[in-house]
Structure formats: C-alpha cells, structure tokens
Amino acid sequence: TPEGWSVTPWTWDWYRQENWAVKTGKQFNDAVQYRRFGGDLQGVLNKLDYLQNLGVTALFMNPLNDAPSLHKYDARNYHHIDVNFGPDPVGDNKIIASENPADPKTWQWTAADKLFLKLVAEAHKRGMKIIMDYSWNHTGTSFWAFEDLVKYQEKSVYKDWYNVTSFDNPATPENEFAFEGWLGNKFLPEIKKVDLTTERKTGHAYEGNINEGAKQHIFAVTKRWLAPDGDVTNGIDGFRLDVADHIGLGFWRDFRKVVRSVQPEAYLVGEIWWEQWPDQLMNPVPYTSGDVFDAVMFYQAYRPARYFFARTNTEINAQQLKDSLLYQWNRLLPDNRYAMMNTSSTHDSPRLLSDFYNTNKYKYHANPNEDK
C-alpha cells in the first residue's frame, strides 16, 4: 500500500484524491485502485432492515471469494469468503493454510464463511435472496493451483489447468515461464479451454468446455455454497457468472445441470456484453434458450434508456425507445423476459441517473471533465 495509506471515508468526493494518493504521484484512475472504504459483511448485516424497508428482495454480491484486490475477480481461493470481510483475518488464514484446497473433504468454515452464512440466513428471514458473483474463466496469480504451477512447472499436477506457453528452463538464468492471461492480463491467468467445436471469437457464443480438473473444483465450490450443510434452505439462491461469453456453452450446460441437481430454484445470470466494443452489444439468445442461463445482464435495455433520458448527441425519441426495447424483448423466450437482470447501474457502469448528465455518446465518459 502507498505510504500513509488509510481507509477512505464513505462520503468522500469521488474525484478528489486523498493526501496519500496525491503523494503517489499517480493519476486518479491509477491511484483510485488503492482506495478502500472499509466495508465488511457485518456492515451488510447491519443494513438488512434498512434494505428490507426499501423493498429490496435480492442482494447481488460482487465477488466475495478470498482475493488480494479490491474487485476480487483475481481469486486466491474460490471456496472461502475473503478473510478481510470477516471478524478474524489472522485466524481465518491459519484455517485456510491447514487445508488441502484440492480436497473438499479438508475444507473448513472460516469466521468469514460463517458470517456470510449468517447473512444468508438473515436475508432469507426477510424474504431476500442472495446471489454470489464468480468468475470461472480465470483466477488470480495467488490462486493455490497457479502457485503450485509456478513452483513445480511441468511437474505440477495443475499444469493443464492453465494455458502455459512455455515452462521455465532451470539451466538458464532467465525465467522462461509464460502463460495466457485473460485479455492479456498477466495478473489473471486464464483457465484452459478444451473441446472446442466452433470458433472461439470474442463477443460470440461458442461450443467448448474447460479443463476437467478445474471444472470439478468449480463444481465442488458451487455445491458448497448452494447447500453448505446439505440443506439448500441454508444456501445461496443463485450465481452471477462473470465474462460468460469467454467460456464455452458446453461448460455452462454442465454447470446448470450441477446447480439444478442441488437447488432446482437457483437463479443463473450470465454477464455477456460486447460483440464489438463500444457500439454493438451481444446477442443474448444463445444464453437464454433454456439450457444455459435464466437471464443475462441486460445492458440492451440500459443503453436505449440512457439515450432517451439523457441529453446526448445520440438522443432518441419515444418511438425509437419503444422500438429498441420491443426488439430486444421479442428476441427472448417468454419465460426469460421477466427474468432479465435489467440494470440501472452496475460495478461496470455509472448509475443511470448520474449518466443522464453525461452529454457524451458513451457511458464510460462519465467524468464531468470529459464533457464535450
């Protein structure tokens, strides 16, 4: 962490840099990655009554899995809640260190895990559902299987979990170890894709699967949270699946079968987004035809709503808004239409109300300094 770093107050002006951030000499977009507001699961528990009074019926939790980053899409352990979200990080790390992460029989419940299950129970008492967010497409470099791979190289039993392009040669002073990271990001090693029978092309559904060992580990984690003590009433209510289009449909069909075998009522929503960034959104139909997801994150509704309500250079009228929404609506099966995750904001997009004041064509130009 930067020198002098501290937790940022909740009401802090978003675009104002903290004193410690200024001292780093980094621009806002770089320094903000170090920002933390200090939230934890107890804080969510404390707000459940407030959320219930607002009429909230489901909580979509961004990744809670143990990970070093602020976003948690760089998993260190899929099967544990991040130790910093619970009451005893030191004790939890000792528990995790005592396990064999490859063997579910050795998995224990940390204090953070137990607090999360308490959150699930309390949410259920209030008629709320809990949806967990996972990225099965990649892990972080501190993920236990990847660390084993780095240490043992071609002798690692996990060498086929990832796309290794070259192993280190111990006879040379250089480190030749190289692997494929998600979208080239070396902090996010990608799980190996197998059994591809159609072209894998960004922004398009394709037929394929993932490495069997990684797949079975993912299934074990899935069952753990759906029925933590063998009783689905004490488990979560569904999953939001990150970068779903980067994984083949074969895996998702198998994943759906596993989920439904444990909890027939579980809700599955996939994140699909760009066919061609930043103008053409993906076709949701391959993912919402009854054998993959119940829904997708429906940015197809967010975009025309913004163009109608905001005063941008891409403004549309009421008829165009209606036509756009009906086009998307009519592409979906009747059972899926009311299940879509229609977003007014996400962790990847500005709040829709805030975005009404963004005069630019694209929502990612949300900084007022970018107004044209």
Language model features by range: what are they?
Residues 2, 65-68, 136-141, 245-246, ...:
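Solvent-exposed loop/turn segments at secondary-structure junctions
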Residues 44, 112, 116, 211-218, ...:
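Aromatic/hydrophobic pocket-lining residues that form the small-molecule binding cavity
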Residues 64, 148-258, 262, 273:
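Polysaccharide-binding and catalytic clefts of secreted carbohydrate-active enzymes
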Residues 120-128, 137-138, 146-153, 220-223, ...:
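Active-site-proximal helices and loops of the catalytic beta/alpha 8
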Residues 1-129, 137, 144, 223:
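N-terminal structural segment of carbohydrate-active enzymes
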Residues 14-38, 96-103, 182-209, 233-236, ...:
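Short glycine/proline-rich turn/loop motifs
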Residues 3-14, 69-87, 136-185, 257, ...:
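Aromatic- and acidic-residue-enriched segments that line the glycan-binding/catalytic groove
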